Amino acid sequence: MHEKSLTELRAALTAKECSAVELAQLYLKRIDAANSLNAFIQVDPDLTLAQAKAADALLHTGHAGPLVGLPIAHKDVFVTKGWRSTAGSKMLSNYESPFDATVVARLQNAGMVCVGKTNMDEFAMGSSNENSYFGPVQNPWDVKAVPGGSSGGSAAAVAARLAPAATGTDTGGSIRQPASFSGITGIKPTYGRVSRYGMIAFASSLDQGGPMAQSAADCATLLNAMAGFDERDSTSLVRDDEDYTRYLGKPWKEESAAKPLAGLRIGLPKEYFGAGLADDVRASVDAALKQYEALGATLVDVSLPKTELSIPVYYVIAPAEASSNLSRFDGVRFGHRAAEYRDLLDMYKKSRAEGFGPEVKRRILVGAYVLSHGYYDAYYLQAQKIRRIIAQDFQEAFKQCDVIMGPVAPSVAWDLGAKGDDPVQMYLADIYTLSVSLAGLPGMSVPCGFGAGANAQRPVGLQIIGNYFNEARMLQVADAFQRATDWHRKAPAGV
């Protein structure tokens, strides 16, 4: 049962092959057995089974929605009533929220059953899930490798079939990169599609929640429940609700059923295929693009000339926003408080020094520096100007194509500990995802192969980038690929 997708599990529930309680018990046992992966920060069987019993009561009425009774894991950046909400940090290691994040509440209202809170890089700052106060997460495909970050716990949980789906957040690639490294599907929607209310903030102009699951079809179903306007989030977009599954299984153009993607133009940015891209990643992406051609799509060369500037721009803007957002954690209102201190100022210093990890401190320092007098204009304002140019580059590219494709990351997952001493090398791994986030565009990762040689068990993801509000079409394009291939069906050995 655990190998089934969300859609298949829903069919099993409808056919009464299992109950929501039995399904929850199955995944709780699997989570316990795979404890060494460290994918979860907190599991509470009593809370989970209470939700499952409520879901079964709904299922018995015969009028339950498409997600009722299905298990889901929540990234521990979403606050959840009744569970601890830690953001992977000592600072919040004992924090319990009095309310649910909008994303959590919407999925719970849709009848989904929470099986636990997943591990993550502290305050979502990281690309490897090694920055968590609760320890690193192992990649289920190769336990010597990182699962990606910051949503590494969610990615590992779905890959190891510890949950059929999970929530994630993406600030600069934190859904797409772990989805790629862990061989699952994940989508970052257009900025503002999914409410940030109750999502512990890292960089408010970049953070965006999204679903992670086995397939594009599963992600589309989840996005139906997650997306939508929320008056409690000032950046939430006022748009009509839409069905993100509406194009699944349909041809790109109605008259082209024989070639389902005939008429689709796929843009290939030359900047995504240059030096620095590993040969095995290039080979898997090229093979996926050939499959798209077989489905009828046309490949078009495009250019995103400011791609290389996305790293310095991101690492000015995101830390600047983080230094402001994280100033609230002072040991007074909430968060870790030092046991011994001389006065109020000393309490602030010691509480923050003890509560934050080294990567978070590094980014707070960078952010405070670029916002300081004399550097604000030189760094922060300059970065915001280039950010606008990056967004304009994408709009020029979309004049020639319908979607843009390329690798998610320059390499497959690296070994645990391999880049911990060199944060710049870690930052460079986000080269293909950062510009999408800076532009506020939707992007997703779809499994498309594996590395070579010693990396033969480490997955590769294909990145699909759409224009604003084009998620339904992106999911259609991803789903067509998954109907023609089985990469998304593959699971780690022993799972």
From Swiss-Prot:
It is an enzyme of class 6 (ligase). Pfam families: Amidase (PF01425). GO terms for molecular function: ATP binding; glutaminyl-tRNA synthase (glutamine-hydrolyzing) activity. The gene is gatA. It comes from the Bacteria. Belongs to the amidase family. GatA subfamily. It catalyses: L-glutamyl-tRNA(Gln) + L-glutamine + ATP + H2O = L-glutaminyl-tRNA(Gln) + L-glutamate + ADP + phosphate + H(+). Gene3D superfamilies: Amidase signature (AS) domain. Heterotrimer of A, B and C subunits. It comes from Paraburkholderia phytofirmans (strain DSM 17436 / LMG 22146 / PsJN). This is Glutamyl-tRNA(Gln) amidotransferase subunit A. Keywords: ATP-binding, Ligase, Nucleotide-binding, Protein biosynthesis.
